Amino acid sequence: MSMTSSVRVEWIAAVTIAAGTAAIGYLAYKRFYVKDHRNKSMVNPHIQKDNPKVVHAFDMEDLGDKAVYCRCWRSKKFPLCDGSHTKHNEETGDNVGPLIIKKKDT
């Protein structure tokens, strides 16, 4: 075996080991890191989790002059807004705000 042939074999072995290590690292990243982000991006973290679909309905006549509803799902007074979206926006970089329903000024 010549000198260039043995160098070529060493390079092939090194590239194979590096590619295998990169593949294992990528699979570990996908398994452990990406999974955590999927759970953190869930819109509703804790409100009525036993219910398959959370729905609230209100009669327009019962709202009064103004009603402010939560859209970030973090409010302790859900479905009403308590300003929790401010902290949520700071933590996530989101820009969600409340839904404000008010009577039209005549």
UniProtKB/Swiss-Prot annotation:
Protein residues bound to [2Fe-2S] cluster: C70, C72, C81, H85
Know the name of this protein? CDGSH iron-sulfur domain-containing protein 1
Q: Which residues form the active site?
A: K53 (schiff-base intermediate with pyridoxal 5'-phosphate)
Post-translational modification comment from the UniProt entry: Ubiquitinated by PRKN during mitophagy, leading to its degradation and enhancement of mitophagy. Deubiquitinated by USP30.
The UniProt function text for this chain reads:
L-cysteine transaminase that catalyzes the reversible transfer of the amino group from L-cysteine to the alpha-keto acid 2-oxoglutarate to respectively form 2-oxo-3-sulfanylpropanoate and L-glutamate.
Q: Provide the reaction this enzyme catalyses.
A: L-cysteine + 2-oxoglutarate = 2-oxo-3-sulfanylpropanoate + L-glutamate
Classification via Pfam families? MitoNEET_N, zf-CDGSH
